[in-house]
Amino acid sequence: GKVNPSGKLPMSFPKHVGQQMVNYNRKLSSLWAGYVEGDNQPLWEFGYGLSYTTFAYDALTIDKTSVCVDDVLKVSVDVANTGDRAGEEVVQLYIHDLYSVVTRPIKELRDFRRVALAPGERKRVEFTLPVERLGALDENMRFTVEAGDYEIMAGSSSADRNLLKTTITVKK
């Protein structure tokens, strides 16, 4: 290949025709979410992509561990091209409200950045995340940012094995 692919899937892709869609942003539930036969993992998860090179993620950092609703959070992560070809990677930033009044998805994509890296090159990818982007509709259908703990995740796809994680606290 003269061209190194760098696209990412906009959906989770099932393993077989009979498997229901497995969404990256499914709601947390105590009910059984699997199947009688087979597992409930997709063949390829949301954000998955192919490349002729490999990338490694490291050093997820945030500038504050405690924030107010009107603050802006700066998130950064190091990405390295560990392969022998130049390539582009799409770094994905997810959030999760750990203790929400309403049921929210396990992961919510909040931002992404495309970064080009030469073989062996390492770059720090930075995100500016207004705290208000952590919000959602409450039980009265009003947009609100709840006080409490939120998980910030960065990686190459929505799969847990690919995500670096840290936690912040939102204060009212």
What is each model feature region?
Residues 72, 94, 108-110, 142-144, ...:
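Short intrinsically disordered coil segments
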Residues 56, 61, 78, 111-118, ...:
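Generic structural detector for well-ordered beta-strands
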Residues 86-93, 105, 138-139:
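Short, hydrophobic/aromatic beta-strand segments
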Residues 1-88, 94-96, 147, 151-155, ...:
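Secreted, periplasmic, or luminal enzymes acting at the cell surface/secretory milieu
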